[in-house]
């Protein structure tokens, strides 16, 4: 999917500030451009545009999604080793480490801070253990829902 900015852009730079990969450039008060090679299709830019100037590949305005429509990260806790690669890669500080009761898991596991997650897939790409996936809440597979590990108090 490729997003684009149309001529109604007022150059407020809100999208530039929100883009985790610096894929958007432009002068203040001028038309901005999205570099498709850098864009990760996270959709973080659209909801902050005050003039609805960011369109998706179908020409639809990229607006704020309802909470249940928004894709977010889900951790497959049995596969998470606590390596923190996803935490380090997340541009929105949407992941944190939490301890677990199992003493063999001294590193802990990753927890998603849902309010910060945009579903940009950077964590999913960074995980070498296939322990993190991006889904809408209403489409999460049962095997992932049932993968909870007992966390330390």
Regions found by a protein language model. Name each.
Residues 1-8, 16-17, 37-153:
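Flanking helices and flexible, charged tails adjoining ferredoxin-like Fe-S electron-transfer domains
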Residues 26:
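Glycine-rich phosphate/oxyanion-binding loops and their immediately adjacent helices
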């Amino acid at each position: 999917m490729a997003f684009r900015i149309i001529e109604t852009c007022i150059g407020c730079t809100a999208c530039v500030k929100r883009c985790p990969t610096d894929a958007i450039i432009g002068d203040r008060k001028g038309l901005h451009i999205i570099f498709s090679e850098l864009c990760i299709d996270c959709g973080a830019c659209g909801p902050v545009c005050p003039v609805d100037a960011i369109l998706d590949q179908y020409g639809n305005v990229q607006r704020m999604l309802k909470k249940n429509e928004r894709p977010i990260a889900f951790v497959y806790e049995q596969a998470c080793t606590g390596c923190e690669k996803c935490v380090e890669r997340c541009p929105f500080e949407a992941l944190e480490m939490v301890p677990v009761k199992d003493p063999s898991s001294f590193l802990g596991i990753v927890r998603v801070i849902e309010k910060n997650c945009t579903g940009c897939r950077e964590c999913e790409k960074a995980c070498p253990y296939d322990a993190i996936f991006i889904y809408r809440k209403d489409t999460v597979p049962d095997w992932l829902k049932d993968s909870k590990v007992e966390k330390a108090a």
